[in-house]
């Protein structure tokens, strides 16, 4: 199933939200999320700092402020969440985002790009599908944007090497 114009708009919003965490989430990626019911935005969030709640949980809590993870108990049944990067499915400093999405009753997850981190890569999407959640991977320009957005994280997750930017200046005659 392809993305509608509204899906693309909301996924682009999630990518915009992710930028708010830039420079503060290392070693984690930057991630943004938007929760909707019947196409109406009811919650937004982004991953603010490493060790704190991930974007998906922040957005779910914004949508249902009276509850906290993992006590969502189906309160958002029928909701859709748009996420800039595949939800995590492993325990780290925080519980798996996939568990929070399932507990909240989210029925559709639209993802801009898969997570390259070996503990997550494809496993988050598979976990959601096994739970009966419809999963849509964007592809196209939004996926490319999401991959670029987390370029340094992708480099580290895939190769174990740092992302290095080298700036060099010289005069026209080749002197430094």
Please give the residue ranges for each predicted region:
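Local cysteine-cluster metal-coordination motifs and their immediate loop/turn environment
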Residues: 46, 53-57, 81-100, 119
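Zinc-dependent deaminase
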Residues: 1-22, 41, 71-77, 92-176
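Short, basic and Ser/Thr-rich N-terminal targeting/leader segments
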Residues: 27-31, 53, 162-164
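Charged/polar positions on well-ordered alpha helices
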Residues: 16, 20-23, 47, 57, ...
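N-terminal beta-alpha supersecondary unit
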Residues: 33, 41-62
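Mobile, glycine- and charge-enriched loop segments
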Residues: 60-91
């Amino acid at each position: 199933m392809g993305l509608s114009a509204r899906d693309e708009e909301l996924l682009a919003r999630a990518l915009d939200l992710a930028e708010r965490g830039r420079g503060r989430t290392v070693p984690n990626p930057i991630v943004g999320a938007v929760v909707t019911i019947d196409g109406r935005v009811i919650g937004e969030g982004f991953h603010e700092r490493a060790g704190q709640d991930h974007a998906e949980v922040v957005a779910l809590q914004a949508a249902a402020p009276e509850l906290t993870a993992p006590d969502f108990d189906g309160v958002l049944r029928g909701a859709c969440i748009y996420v800039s990067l595949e939800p995590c499915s492993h325990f780290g400093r925080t519980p798996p985002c996939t568990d929070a999405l399932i507990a909240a009753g989210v029925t559709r997850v639209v993802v801009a790009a898969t997570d390259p981190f070996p503990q997550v890569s494809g496993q988050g999407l598979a976990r959601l599908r096994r739970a009966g959640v419809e999963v849509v991977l964007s592809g196209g320009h939004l996926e490319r944007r999401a991959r670029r957005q987390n370029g340094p994280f992708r480099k580290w997750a895939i190769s174990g090497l740092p992302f290095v930017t080298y700036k060099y200046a010289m005069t026209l005659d080749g002197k430094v």
